[in-house]
């Protein structure tokens, strides 16, 4: 009996040490090449045709990229202008609104979980048209050291341009936390299964389903436009929050479907508004 107890104790120690050596905040698949990565599950080569290809649930599929509807645009730009005004008067931002997108994903479980599903709040924003990226980047870089009030005015003037400046087929975000040593559930899922849903807590309440394109700033395979997208995403983040000592992973969400989840409206309550029914996406 004593021999069995010694053996079990030894096994427990070995198991504990093994768990200590294994990085549980990581997946059992390596998505990195040293300190960078290239997302292999998204093909952006046909964006000029309005098409994005993605590997979803193990098979490559084509998706037509669509515009966020006018209602979403008016709500988003209007709420952003109102948030800038709150900062001018010394008030904190609201949690509700177009900045905080709740991103639902599914793909691969992190080693500390039995579930491959994940949900996380991500800061979202508008992305200028490809041909306007360099111009906006130059403007932001030349004014980033101005007084905060002046920067608020400049952001307000940019938002007032609406879709004359910003591309209504996409939203942009940053993956702030994922590294070769630590991977978020959102990062893991989007790397292997880039389809996701993004919903906003507000009234009206919009949801869009999208293909997420992840771009590491040091990825040598990025196109010139993709490099500018990553640069812009980091710059607009620093423009408001202050400088950071690193460039973060950029994420562009290409819009495929849009839903109006607003309560109390018979034409909403989860109805798909883009593309309009009965057309299948």
Predicted regions and their residues:
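Sec-dependent signal peptide recognition
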Residues: 2-8
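Binding-site signature for planar aromatic cofactors or substrates
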Residues: 19-281
